[in-house]
Design a protein with these regions (language model features):
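Non-globular targeting/processing and membrane-anchoring segments
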Residues: 1-56, 78, 82-85, 101-109, ...
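Thiol-based oxidoreductase modules, predominantly thioredoxin-like and allied folds used
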Residues: 58-64, 76, 84-100, 117
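Conserved redox-active cysteine motifs that mediate thiol-disulfide chemistry
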Residues: 64-71
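A short secondary-structure junction signal
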Residues: 71-72, 126
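Short, well-ordered alpha-helical packing segments
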Residues: 73, 77-80, 111-115
């Protein structure tokens, strides 16, 4: 969080687009991330972390300005904190495009993208992202509308409202299923 807070204090963001809009998204996302870290309700079956078969390393491609990351990455951080044998590292997508291009979602560089590997062998165990299945369905419905008819602001509001009411339960359930 220290890097996130510092970049907000500097009125900047990650990635090549340092426009005022991206800086504003970054500030908003710090607030969202802090809120989830403060009031995240873990599923009862995750109180003691994930049931890993073997130690894992999780690498998450992300950016500070990404709204989905602000909703999902705090869950990953909390799971890593609670799970013995799980290490977590966040890296910026736009600094690792060659890696990102191996993990495209429907041809796009959707983030956050979690890549889980076996800590002993380096074998990929699974990937997840950029958002829970139900949230992806909302995005897919939006993308089905002709570009000239899309209401981007309404879509963002609907997506973040969905995240609020979901309470990060879907992220937890999906990651639990992948680790079980």
């Amino acid at each position: 969080m220290a890097g996130f807070e510092r970049i907000v204090d500097e009125r900047s963001t990650s990635g090549p687009d340092r426009s005022e809009a991206m800086v504003a998204y970054t500030k908003l996302n710090l607030s969202r991330s802090r809120r989830w870290l403060k009031q995240l309700n873990m599923l009862p079956e995750l109180e003691n972390g994930l049931p890993l078969v073997a130690p894992q390393n999780w690498l998450v491609l992300t950016e500070y300005w990404c709204g989905d990351a602000a909703q999902c990455c705090p869950v990953m951080a909390e799971l890593a904190r609670r799970t013995p044998g799980l290490t977590l590292r966040f890296v910026f997508r736009d600094e690792h495009l060659a890696l990102m291009d191996h993990y495209l979602t429907e041809g796009g560089r959707g983030i956050p993208k979690l890549i889980a590997v076996d800590a002993a062998t380096g074998t990929e165990r699974f990937t997840w992202g950029p958002r829970p299945v139900a949230a992806q369905a909302l995005v897919d419905t939006f993308r089905a509308v002709p570009v000239e008819q899309r209401d981007v602001e309404a879509m963002k509001e609907a997506l973040h409202t969905w995240y609020f009411y979901d309470g990060c339960a879907s992220v937890q359930q999906e990651l639990l299923a992948l680790c079980s």
